[in-house]
Amino acid sequence: ATSQGEILRANINFDYRFCPLNTHFFWAEFKLNFGFDTLKDEALKNARSNQPSGASFGSIFKNPKNDFAGRLIEAVGLKGFSKGDAMLSDKHANFLINKKNASFEDAFFLIELARKKVFEEFGTNLENEVIII
């Protein structure tokens, strides 16, 4: 880091789901290139085609090695399951949806229910995609 607390991208080795800076970011500055990459746009559209739109917590769990969290959650019968206004998406079971006014308690209940049922059925411990503080 510089004397002003700045860290350059070249000094950070980001990887898929890994940031060596185990901390929170309060500010970032990005340099953007002008233009449009149609290949990246198509890849993004394909990736999002099976994901729900609207208010979403996003992916709940990381995919376990050699499997998919969404497949496991669906296999235990929780795809589309709701508690209050929180719902495990009926489009992709690893997405948590806020139907209107979901509470933290309802969302957390669904996260723990999915983790418990998947472990009971498959012996797989699902790891959170996000950190709950």
Feature roles, as predicted:
Residues A1:
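DPxDG-like acidic metal-binding loop motif
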Residues Q4-F109, L113-K116, E121-I133:
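Phosphate/pyrophosphate- and phosphate-bearing ligand-binding catalytic cores of soluble enzymes
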